[in-house]
Swiss-Prot record:
PANTHER family: CYTOCHROME B (PTHR19271:SF16). Its main location: mitochondrion. It comes from Myotis annectans. GO terms for cellular component: mitochondrial inner membrane; respiratory chain complex III. Heme b b566 binds at residues 97, 196. The keyword Membrane applies. Heme b b562 binds at residues 83, 182. The chain crosses the membrane at residues 33-53, 77-98, 113-133, 178-198, 226-246, 288-308, 320-340, 347-367. This is Cytochrome b. Heme 1 (or BL or b562) is low-potential and absorbs at about 562 nm, and heme 2 (or BH or b566) is high-potential and absorbs at about 566 nm. Gene3D superfamilies: Cytochrome Bc1 Complex, Chain C (1.20.810.10). Binds 2 heme b groups non-covalently. Its cofactor is heme b. Disulfide bonds: none annotated.
Length: 379
């Protein structure tokens, strides 16, 4: 008799995706972040669902409803901080996942890579809308500043902003629609994740060597299920420590002040995971230029496969490319730091130099180094 997991139509899909899936025998812990992202997404949907049961998307009561969740709902504070810090964990895993894709050349699977970029954009949009919901000072002013950037689009900009706001300023209509979209998007993300996995399983996983691994595959279960569970446990430990000991470490104190359209905070800044893009936006003293640079800072990932000039896929045997990769990582950390600083000397010039370096590394230096390495290897 055939095993039910191999014969049942639904079980067969699960079996071919998570149990009998042939996986390269040498993939390292850098390949754990896909499963960690799945866990983060499930955690966010679950905690978000329970938070939505108590939250009210009205400008008069939104701030108080979040306070009510923290004070009066049983374990409401845990839910709220798990959701807020879960978003931070989500982005840490996302950035590491993308970084691993760049380092090991996984971007050569173009369908998987492009769906991943769309996923990144969708998650960023979801996180931004979620940040507006508590209706604190930084929520309100963050929403005002970021949505206002669309007014830089010629001809239709102003109309577009007012259409998104649902009025002439960020108000009740804006909050209600942001809540609706924030609730809807994670389910769209879940569907896109399935497409992401579908494309990945068409080609099979990449591996640290960047060479075909068809000759040496092992079943996903039990080898990588055990490995993924270890990663999940470590992430839960970090998240629990954050939630239980310093839940507000990554947040902004200004968001504990109710939104006031008449009082602007001294430094308007987004959550920490958007600071690198915010620094790139601020480094250009022109509104439209800044918006274009902001969009391109993420959209540049699309052209990375086209700029791959090396005869080798992975960076594991390319020390010059490795140096450039880690320079890019350091540059992104500098941009993240600059994004949280006030707009004054010397932060302005540091931000501008870091922004130029960011685009230069990806567009100019990476392909040049690839050609150089090919020449050194006489290929």
């Amino acid at each position: 008799m055939t095993n039910i997991r191999k014969s049942h139509p639904l079980m067969k899909i699960i079996n071919n995706s998570f149990i009998d899936l042939p996986a390269p025998s040498n993939i390292s812990s850098w390949w754990n972040f896909g499963s960690l992202l799945g866990v983060c997404l499930m955690l966010q949907i679950l905690t978000g669902l329970f938070l939505a049961m108590h939250y009210t998307s009205d400008t008069m009561t939104a701030f108080n409803s979040v306070t009510h969740i923290c004070r009066d709902v049983s374990y409401g504070w845990t839910l709220r901080y798990l959701h807020a810090n879960g978003a931070s964990m989500f982005f840490i895993c996302l950035y590491l996942h993308v970084g691993r894709g760049i380092y090991y050349g996984s971007y050569t699977y173009s369908e998987t890579w492009n769906i991943g970029i769309i996923l990144l954009f969708t998650v960023m949009a979801t996180a931004f809308m979620g940040y507006v919901l508590p209706w604190g000072q930084m929520s309100f002013w963050g929403a005002t500043v970021i949505t206002n950037l669309l007014s830089a689009i010629p001809y239709i900009g102003t109309n577009l902003v007012e259409w998104i706001w649902g009025g002439f300023s960020v108000d009740k209509a804006t909050l209600t629609r942001f809540f609706a979209f924030h609730f809807l998007f994670p389910f769209i993300i879940s569907a896109m994740v399935m497409v992401h996995l579908l494309f990945l399983h068409e080609t099979g996983s990449n591996n640290p060597m960047g060479i075909p691994s068809n000759v040496d595959m092992i079943p996903f279960h039990p080898y990588y299920t055990i490995k993924d569970i270890l990663g999940v446990l470590l992430m839960i430990m970090v998240l629990s420590t954050l939630v239980l000991f310093s839940p507000d470490m990554l947040g902004d104190p200004d968001n504990y002040i109710p939104a006031n359209p008449l009082n602007t905070p001294p430094h308007i800044k987004p959550e920490w995971y958007f600071l690198f893009a915010y620094a790139i936006l601020r480094s250009i003293p022109n509104k439209l230029g800044g918006v274009l640079a902001l969009t391109l800072s993420i959209l540049i990932l699309v052209i990375i496969p086209m700029l791959h000039m090396s005869k080798q896929r992975s960076m594991i045997f390319r020390p010059l490319s490795q140096c450039l990769f880690w320079l890019l990582v350091a540059d992104l950390l500098i941009l993240t730091w600059i994004g949280g600083q006030p707009v004054e000397h010397p932060y302005i010039i540091i931000g501008q130099l870091a922004s130029i370096l960011y685009f230069s590394i990806i567009i100019i230096l990476m392909p040049l180094i690839n050609f150089m390495e090919n020449y050194l290897l006489k290929w």
